[in-house]
Amino acid sequence: MKEKRERVVQFLKANYKGEFVVSETPNDNGKYEVSSNGKLTLISNIEHLTSEDFVFTQVDYFNCCDSILLQTLEGAPEKARVFDCSGCISLQTLKGAPQEVEELYCISCHSLQTLKDAPQKANEFYCSYCTSLETLEGVPGMVEKFECSGCDSLKTLKGAPQKARIFNCSDCKSLQTLEYAPLEVDEFYCFDCNSLKSLENAPQQARVFDCCGCIALRTLEGSPKKVEKFICIYCTSLQSLEGAPQEANKFNCSYCPSLRTLEGAPQKTEKFDCSGCESLQTLKGGPGEAKWFYCSGCTSLQSLEGAPEEVEVFDCNNCQSLKSLNGAPKEAIIFDCSNCSSLESLIGVPKKVEKFYCTGWESPKYLESAPQKMEEFDCRKAYGKKNL
């Protein structure tokens, strides 16, 4: 009996790293029970997680990453808080994974073809950067946080967990439609998607929606209408904001090299950001009631016409094309036009501004019409200034 237990101990020491406890006597099936309150990591390439002499019962964090021979999860712990089988190139099914796991990771798996037999009680599930998975069928239906970002093979969201609170399918190179996306999700991320052409079937109840960095998305039609925070920065294909959610509290379409007009921008958003835009020539159609407005770093903006008039914070610093402040918001409390290389005059500056920044100017010669009641005024490094 002692020899059998010693074989179990030696097997674990040879193939696993971490602390573990082996029962003193075998169970009714004649096998020793092994548990761990810490992290137990598989460190050798073996075809089976256990030997015929023992079983895993409960492990806090079980890690069998990067195994190149493991074809089955049979013998995995019955219960685990975290279960990680990422990087496996031989595993084709999740059968045998602990059913009561809280967090499950199978990231960068190149052999997993189905999520059937996945543990249905997982709170968090990650199958990111999978090159073999074509469908989400089998995903735990009640999972709260689900991530399948960077998937090279996923063609449909069929089987996606409909009750997920956070859903991330970003950096997907094969997904063309959001059909079957979880409808009641709170936060939805599909940024850096190289294949998504339409937001049709996007979840309409999302509080946060992020589709930034999309190189295929041409329209915002189908975007969630009641979203609070909407992000589509670095989108290289978006030409119009038509279809944008009109009730978003925060809207960010900065660094878009293709957007030429703000027509369709949500009018009642509180915080609007179109900074770094390389194609925007006018603010016409911009949100008229925004409290914070950022158009800094614009290389194409020539006029502030259309800027929200009652904005509190206005930022157009590092603007390389703006020549005049005519049309600038009149009620701004904070106004920043520092490092503007093209601005020639301060005519049009808001008169009630409290904090005004025009540091780093190289072109202005006069500060005519400068604000008179400000608390802070900074025009350091204004090399071309000759007259105050």
Q: What is each stretch, according to the model?
A:
Residues 15-88, 101, 290:
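LRR N-terminal entry segment and analogous cap-like coil->beta motifs
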Residues 69-368, 372:
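Thr-biased low-complexity repeat/linker tracts and other Thr-enriched repetitive architectures
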Residues 387-388:
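Ankyrin-repeat-protein effector appendages
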